[in-house]
Amino acid sequence: MALSLAINVPPVRDNLLRPQPFQSQFRPNLLKFPIPSSARIRCSSSSSFNDISLKTVTPDNKNSFVCRFNATQLEVQETNQPYAETYAVGRHIRMSADKARRVVDQIRGRPYEASLMVLELMPYRACEAIIKIVFSAGANASHNLGLSKSSLFISKAEVNEGKTLKRVRARAQGRANQILKRTCHITITVRGLPDESDKEENSS
């Protein structure tokens, strides 16, 4: 004799069994194309954005700290005035070229005043010699060419190997080891615009 049992099973929802993706409450505001005409790209670069698929936008120059292109690294002149260059060289610096390059690489393309601040805060022995060369290059630009220090930037910074001093250190059993004392030559080139106050005095 067969028995049949009828059990009422509640329906199971599919959304309870399927794993739900993680949804964060912090969602970034993604940029959608095409850009509306009211949108603005905060950038202090004077170059126009030439893309057919996007609408032309006007740069916002009110905030100088957001999305600022470094024109010194891109070698772009933002003004029609010609730049002038001068340099300072430190020869036979008593340190290896590799130790000086790791410091020089941090100031290449930076403004003159910012480079001095960076060199004062870096904990390397090479900063003491490099900061003197940078300061000398800025003095040459201000005194010899009449450039404004606020417009100066490090356009070129090179470190080349100099002469190697060879010394001998006595070792055990009558032997001797050679000591190589490296030197380097550091060249700092600054570029800037003439001082406006000097122009007014010359014109008057």
Curated annotation (Swiss-Prot):
Q: Which Pfam families match?
A: Ribosomal_L22
Per UniProt, which keywords does this protein have? Chloroplast, Plastid, Ribonucleoprotein, Ribosomal protein, RNA-binding, rRNA-binding, Transit peptide
Q: Does the keyword Ribosomal protein apply?
A: yes
**PROSITE patterns membership:** RIBOSOMAL_L22
Briefly, what is this protein's role? This protein binds specifically to 23S rRNA.
Similarity comment: Belongs to the universal ribosomal protein uL22 family.
Annotated protein name in UniProt: Large ribosomal subunit protein uL22c
What organism does this protein naturally occur in?
Pisum sativum
Q: Which gene encodes it?
A: rpl22
